[in-house]
């Protein structure tokens, strides 16, 4: 398709060996470091080049496993899952087959987030870590999503932290485009999209931080 017409940088023969060597050096250095919880072998495989990402995904998993790290490995399953448990494409099926746990991305509102999470836990008997979430514009909020993850005993990462040069406090262009195409779409552009703290290190919303602290404390008691 047109969106996959360009080359990924690892598809250039002069670049790929450098990339693989870098990956090997990093894993060798930290493979027994207890500060590393897990290895995300590839972020959102297939997003850039579709099924052409599968050979690289297999190579990277083989390389990292050959180095015998103490930590588990995963690649993101981020298109979601059908309610019958079927993964949506060959890239996701490959990522799941190679992974030790499910690395799940979702910026969906509560109902869709819960449906996907329930389906993963029902059909795939592996730990789940939500490695990307929080999109207030799309009603994926700390108030609704964080307590749900705690109750379901699902780990999570909030990749953004302080308002900065990534500008992810602002909605992605794709959200603006959807809103322009459909004025009735249910986005709230009055809110920050992402990040938890302002440049002055005060919380964007102190209530969010209190929720995170409160539910972390409850989780510690389990």
Question: What residue ranges belong to the model's regions?
Answer:
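Active-site mouth of glycoside hydrolases
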Residues: 1-99, 105, 123, 133, ...
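Short Gly/charged-rich anion-binding patches and loops
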Residues: 59, 115, 144
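Short low-complexity, flexible loop/linker segments enriched in glycine and/or proline
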Residues: 89-90, 143-146, 171-175
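Active-site beta-to-alpha loop of glycosyltransferases that engages the nucleotide-sugar donor
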Residues: 108
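Short, solvent-exposed beta-strand-terminating loops
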Residues: 155-170, 174
